[in-house]
Amino acid sequence: MGNYGTNIDRKWQNKWEDSNLYHFDTNNLDKKLYVLEMFSYPSGSNLHAGHWFNYGPSDSWARFKRMQGFNVFQPMGFDSFGLPAENYAIKTGVHPKDSTMKNIETMTKQLKSMGAMFHWDNEVITSEPEYYKWTQWMFLQLYKNNLAYRKNAPVNWCPSCNTVLANEQVLDGACERCSSDVIKKDLTQWFFKITDYAEELLEKLDDLDWPENTKSMQKHWIGKSIGAQLTFKIVDSDLSFDIFTTRADTLFGVTYAVLAPENPLVDKITKEDHKAEIEAYKEQAKKQSEIERQSITREKTGVFTGSYAINPINGKKVPVWVGDYVLSTYGTGAVMAVPAHDERDFEFAKKHNLPIEKVIEGGETLPYTEDGIMINSEEFNGLESSKGRSAVVEKLEKENLGVKKINYRLRDWLVSRQRYWGAPIPIVYCDKCGTVAVPEEQLPVKLPYDVEFTPDGKSPLSKCDSFVNTTCPTCGGPAKREVDTLDTFVCSSWYFLRYADNKNSEKAFDPKIINEILPVDKYVGGPEHACMHLLYARFFTKALRDMGYLNFDEPFSSLTHQGLILGPDGLKMSKSKGNTISPDDYIDEFGSDVFRMYLMFGFDYTEGGAWSDEGIKSVSRFVDRVERTLASCRYYINNPSDDKITIDNNEKDLNFVRHNSIKSITEDAEKMQFNTCIARLMEYTNALSKYINEDNKNSKFLKECVEDFIILIAPFAPHFSEEQWELLGMTYSVFNEKWPQFDSKALVKDEIEIAVQVNGKIRDRITIASGLDEESIKETALNSEDVKKYTDGKNIVKIIIIKGRLVNIVVK
């Protein structure tokens, strides 16, 4: 066992804190680098290995960049509002504020034991009034700019969590938090108008240095469709409904239309003798999730309303049905059905014996869903689909029955929640003045402490009279506060803006400061936030830019997703499975640098993998070996015998490894390929070990090599490297050293070994001068005794030379 351990960790953590080593210089922003890891939910009592995998390696990357001369800003905070913290409090019987602050205290100690460069002076805690005052201010800015509104709508309701969920929080028809089946409920809720930014959110994705899969997920979620909105009038009525379609070329093939069960028009057009059946069908639809309703494998159900609509292109009557596969939350809540050219419509028509009329030529069987030539389409016959679409819409535009339109799958962001542990929405309701925004000078609207927050479907704040009853800011009369709280994603949609100006009591942030430090240069976190936090933060940034507060378009210039650390059994860690890994236990045994280095060496950073105790033990043995090797190097440096000043073959060999390590580690660390960085350090250790066992050594040269080695290992083992740097006699931090540059000349060996093949099979390896010309290489290869066995008496067809690697002799 070496000397490295938690005692050395603590020693250097104290020194770093006392010396303010990682100070971010706000007066020198030319080479600023804002490095940010997604902050934690303090809903559990401890950080786990997954948190470490996010924070540790990314801190190593930040250290590496600091040593390259960047002025690094790396803050940390806690996403402390929301369901996870509230559910934890309900489970333990401790008030959310008390349990949250206790958990934050524990997690802060754990994060500090990591030895990361976090700027704790810039900490934010989203559940503190000093922070959520400005979350409420953000709400008011959106409200003033018509980007926040309240409406009655069918919403996703989790009966277990007893709260509304945004569309993004429903996974396969279930609550992302508790996996309960989500149902639909009509409620009056607050929304943010993210759809106003749909096009820009889509367009700007291509400019971002983000994982392609994440960009694809956002593109799919935004879901742009270019088509037309067409109007179908109800027969014998002044009522009508609009549909959106990308296939106006198939309009002559419409044989029926379908409305969503929730569409308000259903009640107005349903004939008396169909009402009972329609009502029963609507009730049944309420029990189905949107995912279930849209499943391609599920049988398509529906009920006829008794009414007919007029196909706008040919004046034909088509029956109007109600079907639960149509959603009121997407498009217009109504669809035209073309069974000959749509699989879903075809299945529905077959089941209900509805007409099927082919209007696009192509395919041997129906439905034919590709483009083709229009047929049975009157004056449009013979047109190719793309031209036909334009021609049909042009005709309908002249008759005010259609218009070209772009549709998006993206829905407005539902932000109100019927839970306690969140930022109160700064709105009051007055009988005289209506809906009134709380004046900015009255912020924050504080969350009361003494509230019964056990979920029962009602907003907990509605039970707190002292909170609910207030005075109208406009007329001074009695009023009632909004009792819903904001979705926790509202808090995290702007936290990256607050860090750099977190003590500002007059503003959410000073635009002058933020516009110099932002955007975030490197953001690190899990891919599970692709369609929620990452999308919402982009929306907030663009909205604040348009209000004049920001001068940049995107919050995160570069994004990296860390992989997932699994339990030793290869399964996702969970307490119920008993396969969780507690960093504290391993740090106590091995030290935080060994834990950090194992995470970087044992896994591809973007992929992760299964935890292995043997893996961390092997890294511990490597650190011990480095310690012994450096001790031997120091001994010779301080006590040289038979010392020399020349650079001979042994020195050249070590110098090659030294500069090859500098080159490789620099390139790989930049790309966050940490496992190969550690592998190069292992090779460098072997080279140092080999050199100190030579008879004659150059102590001055050896010291230079040791210095570079310690600098190279420093980002990956910060405490250990500081200790080794000090033992080498240095009186300043290794992190104040500049990152070394490789010497390309040192990477050119005087002699190299190359393989010699005969007809593609290796027959010998020869050592040649690195600059040897091709004719001399051929001659040396042909003179090899091992090669002659396979070439003598044969015709040499050609000799292929791949410089520095091999010679291939082709014979017959």
Curated annotation (Swiss-Prot):
One of its GO terms (molecular function) is ATP binding. SUPFAM superfamilies: Anticodon-binding domain of a subclass of class I aminoacyl-tRNA synthetases, Nucleotidylyl transferase, ValRS/IleRS/LeuRS editing domain. GO terms for biological process: leucyl-tRNA aminoacylation. Gene3D superfamilies: 3.10.20.590, HUPs (3.40.50.620), Isoleucyl-tRNA Synthetase, Domain 1 (1.10.730.10). It is an enzyme of class 6 (ligase). Keywords: Aminoacyl-tRNA synthetase, ATP-binding, Cytoplasm, Ligase, Nucleotide-binding, Protein biosynthesis. A motif ('HIGH' region) lies at residues 40-51. GO terms for cellular component: cytosol. It catalyses: tRNA(Leu) + L-leucine + ATP = L-leucyl-tRNA(Leu) + AMP + diphosphate. Pfam families: Anticodon_1, tRNA-synt_1, tRNA-synt_1_2, tRNA-synt_1g. A motif ('KMSKS' region) lies at residues 572-576. ATP binds at residue 575. It is found in: Cytoplasm. It comes from the Bacteria. Its EC number is 6.1.1.4. HAMAP family: Leu_tRNA_synth_B. Belongs to the class-I aminoacyl-tRNA synthetase family. NCBIfam families: leuS_bact (TIGR00396). This is Leucine--tRNA ligase. The gene is leuS.
